[in-house]
Amino acid sequence: MTTTMPATADGWDALLSDGGVVRIRPATAADEDRLLALHEAASDRSIYLRYFSLNRRAGDRYVDKVLHGGEDEIVLVAEQQGVVVGMAGCTRLGRTADGEVAMLVADSHQRRGVGTLLLEHLAAVARRAGMRSFVADTLADNGLMQQVFTDAGFRVERHSDVDVTHVRMSLTPTPQAQDAVDLRERRADVASLRHVLAPRSIVVVGASDRPGSVGGAVLRNIIAGHYRGDLKAVNPNRRWVQRLRAYPSVLSLPEPVDLAVVAVPGPAVEQVIRDCGARGIPAAVILSAGFG
């Protein structure tokens, strides 16, 4: 239904429009502090567009409602590296098949497709729960939210009332909805390859000055090829490698890079890859031997 990697018991990993990975999963009561932090970090404009006022206590009440409101509430979160970067919830309206939908995405993650992914997954969950339509009231100048409904590809009806737009979105799958998903998948797949094919920054893990070492040869070739991006080296035993400052581990890098080239012994690879994930590095090329 969306650009989704294999589902796990606690959610689905999905590609964003820029090739980044986000986990979409059901929210639980244990997420309360994370959802409150999402609201606290939101700009005044984001709060105003979401709640039609600058009253931040409205966010606190909403979080309490969706987490503790019972079976009529469905709420999903988008998570990156353990941080909730977006949430979407729907409330069944009485005994109808309508669900009132609302969402909030962290300012720094807007325009990456987080809202669209949340809406797609929420629609699938709500449909399985017997809902047939989403309804929402949005401010007329909330262009991002209007675009999220459009990008989902479902049939959408809009009616304007002064500064508010009333939206009704059918949850019935359509060829147009599938076409929209397919287009997003292709674009996200292409974007995800940029980190490998055209990285703006690289770290060589296992970089060395030692003649004949794979890490040393890789680093020399990158330098000799006049790579124009940001180049870093990781070697726990050296402070400098081939005139580059060497960091003791991936976790000690001052900022994430696009690509890690891993040239360490096979038994050390798993921990390096885990460290890359924890540091927010989206892609890795493994040149190691010694697996078995």
Language-model segments: residues:
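Long, contiguous binding/interaction regions
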Residues: M1-H195, P199
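Catalytic-core regions of core metabolic enzymes
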Residues: T174-G292
